Amino acid sequence: MEAPRAKKIEEKLIKDGDVRIDEYFWLNQREDQKVIDYLNAENQYTNEMMKDTELLQKKLYHEIKSKIKEDDESVPFKFNGYWYISRYETGGEYPIHTRKKENLNEKEEVMFNVNEMAKGHSFYNLAGVNISENNQLAAFGIDTVSRRIYTIRIKDLNTGKLLSDKLENTTGGSVWAADNKTLFYTRKDETLRAFQIWKHKLGTDQSMDQLVFEEKDDTFDTFVFKTKSRKYIVIGSSSTVSDEYRFTAADHPDDDFKIIQPRERNLEYSIEHYGNDFYILTNKDKATNFKLMRTPVEKTEKNNWTDVIAHRPEVFIENFEIFNDFLVLEERFEGLTRINIRNWDGKTDYFLPFKEDVYSAGIGRNPEFDTDILRIGYTSMTTPNSVIDFNMKYKTSEVKKEQEVLGNFNKDDYETKRIWATARDGVKVPVSIVYRKDLKFGPDTPLLQYGYGSYGVNMDVYFSIPRLSLLDRGFIYAIAHIRGGQELGRPWYEDGKLLNKKNTFNDFVDISNYLIENHYTSAKHLYAMGGSAGGLLMGAVMNQAPELYNGIVAQVPFVDVLTTMLDDSIPLTTGEYDEWGNPNEKEYYDYMKSYSPYDNIEKKDYPNLLVTTGLHDSQVQYWEPAKWVAKLRDLKTDHHLLLLKTNMDAGHGGASGRFESLKETALEYSFIFKLEGIKN
């Protein structure tokens, strides 16, 4: 079957005298039948080219699914007199959310059976479940399109009936005031930016709602939450480099909101309330890796803030949790998370002990102050996800749950370690790898290298059931902790954004070279994968070093950087000027143009490539991957596979059911196995 060829229609994109010719610009017309026809033709071609893997895809799907415990439930947590539990039943794609009053022996109360709610929808997402103070009402958000636009409904938990209230065009989240009849929520504008906080009174039409706050700066997003103490409702507004918060008492929802500290560029802070103070995690006073401060509720401006935990250049504070007797810090040191426990009198100061060399740990859900029990999450590439309750007073721990892996899984069959590759500028970059203990490394060993490297998002190690299907077929799996993430602290992020963005791509390529030079694999057997901004990474490394990879999987890739960042009518653009740069300024325009994958396709050989996207994707518009594939097909000089798979129903996150998404994984793995000559 011949590959589809998209029609060329020349579009001149002119910016300050610079002319770019985009022959596939027309693909951004979602309503044009010719666009739909082209996407369908690409899907048909992908299906045809992958036809010889259909049995393998089915096998992989069932292999992965058979390891997942179908009737599974979360560890209960207690909040405001009720225990909350989510569970899955055999055959169910979606969770069932339940609760029990006071103790776990009480009768179960089903709040939401999402399997029932999702009937008749190809995509369904329930989000932002929020229970009123009197425990009688639940507000929740629903998205049935995967555009991340939610309608909020309210359910009476006594009768099981939905109230008539219907709040459209929201983020899905909401906050109840103490009166059980006032609800605060966030609305989105046409670019899907969260820009307004509204106040809704129960039983009234949305047209009667009151606008409480509007964020007029389009580089900021706004949100609303309630403090852990449940005493204050807080409106936050954040950009990439600054924050601003305002608050009002939860039992006085009609009072004006008072600002905590007006926004200043490069002043970042977040807040929590305890006792008579707000506790503030901030980079104030050049605290690059953040410090913890506090200020009285009556005097919140920054000149009143005092240090609780001073800044330490080598330790990055990511999160904190307050208890009556203890302060808990989630920190990052030398690329690994650690949990520091201190009591308020200063006599106790210790770290939770973790046995593995490479792991990921984080503070879990801890809604109560008056307890000595800290709940954390723990995982590694060989240890399934675990929920642990740690007694901070007696230093004892109880594993409440370790994710069950069915079949003959034995974690002792696998090994994980961290290695350090030296980048071209001399910086050492950590890489986490996992493999079967009986695997021998060499030039014929297949290796899948994964990366992201943007927004300060950490690619921490985690356990994955699907990944076992790679490892058990002789693969090494590597996570590249490249610059642009925050694994080694805030400077690691700063060194991989704006005019340092190319460090992200260079790190990934240099890690690939390191893995080849040190005989973990060879270019014939090296594969790369990344999604969204990690898809940009895939496009950039493919342009820079196509000879290093046998195959690449680019999931919902952000590949037309310049055109997207010049279009402030589409989601995320203006809010991301502090991540990529503002292309209306020549220095940033030129720099982005020099690495944007779509603008740098050349007549040369490229690796085998599978590209995935969703027609309704709001984060990376479908036309970016579509245009990229069309242009690659026209210019590339090789006979390698080039496949585009568009999910015509889903958005950025792919399919919504827990098993449906495994079919996407099965396709991606089958693509790699096909290239590797693995048939089962």
Each model region followed by its residue ranges:
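Cap/lid segment of the alpha/beta-hydrolase catalytic domain
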Residues: 115-129, 140-147, 161, 390-396, ...
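Extracellular/periplasmic catalytic domains that process cell-envelope and extracellular macromolecules
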Residues: 18-19, 103-104, 470-471, 602-605, ...
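Short beta-turn/strand-loop junction motif enriched in small, turn-promoting residues
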Residues: 83, 88, 116, 143, ...
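Glycine-rich His-Gly loop
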Residues: 88, 283, 379, 450-454, ...
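Active-site-proximal cap/loop segments of hydrolase catalytic domains
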Residues: 479-680
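Active-site lining segments that contact anionic ligands and/or coordinate catalytic metals
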Residues: 221, 230, 242, 266-268, ...
